[in-house]
């Protein structure tokens, strides 16, 4: 095991006006978890305090080694070292390379990552991926977890992919659009933007997903229905019609031409989203053999027989 810790300088913690560009970086290694943390404790001149840990970045190789990952999580749980609400990330970069990014970011890596997650208003606050999330799927074994994937570039830190864990199985990297569509289908997003033709777009909000499982001839099918409010950003003429239509609706009068224009937009939104969802489902099935809608969470607890049949159908 290898691990790198970044600690803010005490003078910077006390001085709120400090730019906090530099952090103390501690590298530790050990043949097992106990030796790893003993090394870390021994190298630090003061007592190690993990209570203020802001982000835990795991290397992809650890996620793909179930035995080592299990030992690591078991040790963390037994020793109660890290808070379960610590944000979780994945990378392929070396620990020291990640920690050196604070000089580029002009702030500690953990602080930067926390701000990135907190500032993304598209996601529900309760759905932030944490160490506790990893503990949960480790116990459930079949639930999906979409962990933000970090890549360290020369002048910036890139978060444009996800790493999919299906319970204890590492399913691999997934592009951002596929991951966010899956999160949308799992009702973990507050808003989602769709690009239409002619550089037009719609932002969906107040998202609500419903799920129906049907069985016919021994095969289980899942249908996901998404309802949302839409904020349209497109050509000015249609926007004026939209406003005009809303004003008329108050008087219970609707212009048929305006109504048809809006219905066309609604139909395009529905078709575009359906095509994207189908592409997401097919891509995850082919590349990761993964169920992007996280059916285990919805079926495993109360309809176990149907869930097992659904998983069999999915894998075949």
Question: How does the language model describe each region?
Answer:
Residues 1-316:
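Membrane-proximal alpha-helical signals and transmembrane carboxylates
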């Amino acid at each position: 095991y290898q691990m790198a810790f970044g600690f803010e300088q005490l003078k910077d913690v006390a001085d709120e006006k400090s730019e906090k560009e530099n952090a103390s970086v501690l590298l530790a290694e050990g043949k097992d978890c106990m030796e790893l943390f003993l090394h870390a404790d021994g190298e630090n001149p003061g007592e190690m305090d993990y209570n203020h840990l802001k982000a835990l970045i795991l290397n992809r190789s650890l996620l793909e080694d179930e035995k080592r990952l299990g030992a690591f999580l078991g040790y963390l749980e037994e020793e109660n070292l890290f808070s379960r609400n610590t944000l979780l990330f994945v990378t392929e970069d070396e620990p020291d390379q990640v920690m050196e990014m604070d000089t580029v970011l002009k702030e500690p890596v953990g602080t930067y990552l926390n701000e990135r997650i907190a500032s993304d208003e598209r996601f529900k606050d309760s759905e932030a991926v944490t160490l506790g999330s990893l503990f949960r799927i480790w116990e459930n074994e079949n639930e999906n977890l979409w962990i933000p994937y970090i890549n360290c570039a020369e002048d910036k830190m890139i978060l444009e992919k996800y790493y999919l864990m299906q319970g204890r199985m590492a399913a691999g990297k997934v592009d951002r659009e596929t991951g966010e569509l899956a999160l949308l289908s799992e009702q973990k997003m507050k808003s989602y933007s769709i690009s239409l033709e002619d550089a037009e777009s719609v932002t969906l909000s107040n998202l609500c997903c419903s799920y129906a499982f049907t069985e016919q001839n021994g095969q289980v099918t899942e249908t996901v229905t998404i309802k949302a409010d839409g904020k349209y950003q497109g050509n000015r003429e249609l926007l004026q019609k939209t406003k005009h239509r809303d004003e008329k609706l108050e008087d219970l009068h609707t212009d048929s031409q305006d109504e048809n224009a809006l219905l066309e937009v609604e139909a395009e939104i529905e078709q575009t989203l359906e095509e994207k969802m189908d592409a997401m489902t097919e891509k995850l099935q082919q590349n990761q053999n993964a169920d992007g809608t996280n059916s285990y969470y919805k079926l495993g607890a109360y309809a176990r027989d149907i869930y097992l049949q659904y998983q069999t159908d999915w894998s075949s």
